[in-house]
């Protein structure tokens, strides 16, 4: 007997494992049914698309479950942080379309963290170690062998308190002392083997100036900041899985410190949940390597359109919706994977197809003369802005005797399946007339410098004569009414699929042809008037956006992505 389930009234749902865990906590009434997340960037660089995945999760969970997502800058290392990064992080989150609740800084809690560290020392849970970094590392042991206790591990509490105070003075020498948590040197989790929780840094802080000379380590500040703010779900990437026991241990200490441990260690505390990072083919996400690319001028700054940074993608012409759609499509799992950058580009194409204005631009021009078109005459043709969006309207493009077309759209001796322009064949000039090629002119070196054709006056778009079947349709611009432009075409920054896993120096993996600049391009005036932030499709070529380097004399355009995936074709060969 076959049993059929009646699912007609069931809501079809597809949620991530993170959302499942959040829903379990809500069902159990944890944290009073309250949801609070946070996005905690360190202001030591620009956000990249990997951060966008975390942003979508942090803000998405809060929005879905009617909670709040705050923004917290983990600014515990003044030697690498500044306000430039803070401002750009704010801009990038806004660009993605998210709104935070409150803005916090780990530096807001420096005094509270200091007081907590003093409490740890007084209760025998921390000590000042005067060994070198190398000595401490040697004593850590291995995952299968216990570590060796520091000779300072059992120093008197009063002595550690006095030295800890000395660490926070202008005279303290960086590296001379650290504060370590006194945990378990035999724990198989290496992070538990008396981790360093404070170190001396004499660089002025971008917010607190020279008030502090001793700063908390990330593992000491992060969970405590979550706890201070009332975060319910601390969502992070998989590399923090081994850090979770330490995160929980410090929260346990905090609950003892503030007197809430008696109410239950599991009450009102943040829960750390880890998901897989976003890794892309032909891309590096390492902040260190991205810094190197910028510092060594291997790219033109953090917003170079070849960079995986959000500001670079924005400048290149990616839409925030395409980035978010891509992230939704790859999902969140417990396993790291390498995602094909072609999937991101497909998401960009799909979104820009719906919103990009179609314009005419010729990147490799050759002159086309319509020999039977009246001398000195100009006509205005109507061009649809976006066939996918009726509300986008139209604009006018001028037509005259002399035009520019793409050099690749002409062949003097064309094969049978070449449906573009060649002698004796008809093609349609988009939004204009059907023309027949009658010949071409070459220079002394045999290069084609001009193409001739005749037009059919009855074949104008919209007229009855335009209905006849012509296989080829070409784009063009009026040679007497166009604007010379610069076009920057971008390719993969690295020529190997997984540069992060390649053992060679990553400098050797850079694609020398990742940027091609064309300076002899022509665009219609309507295209030249476009500003950065307006999405364009150069017909039959790809998606583009005006660059901030544009000026009234020479507009500059960045190629966002081609109409088709050219790399897929290359890989099939």
Language-model features: locations:
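A glycine-rich helix N-cap at a beta->alpha junction
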Residues: 85-111, 116-119, 124-127
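Residue-level signal for inorganic ion chemistry
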Residues: 29, 58, 89, 120, ...
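Long, charged, mostly alpha-helical binding arms that flank functional sites
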Residues: 263, 267-347
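Active-site cores that bind ATP or allylic diphosphates and position pyrophosphate for catalysis
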Residues: 71, 75-77, 105, 119-290, ...
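Conserved short loop/turn motifs at secondary-structure junctions
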Residues: 40-43, 72-80, 102-111, 134, ...
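N-terminal catalytic cores of NTP/NDP-binding nucleotidyl/phosphoryl-transfer enzymes
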Residues: 11-90, 206-237
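Basic/polar N-terminal segments that are highly enriched at the extreme N-terminus
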Residues: 1-13, 572-573
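Substrate/cofactor-recognition hotspot
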Residues: 295, 326-573
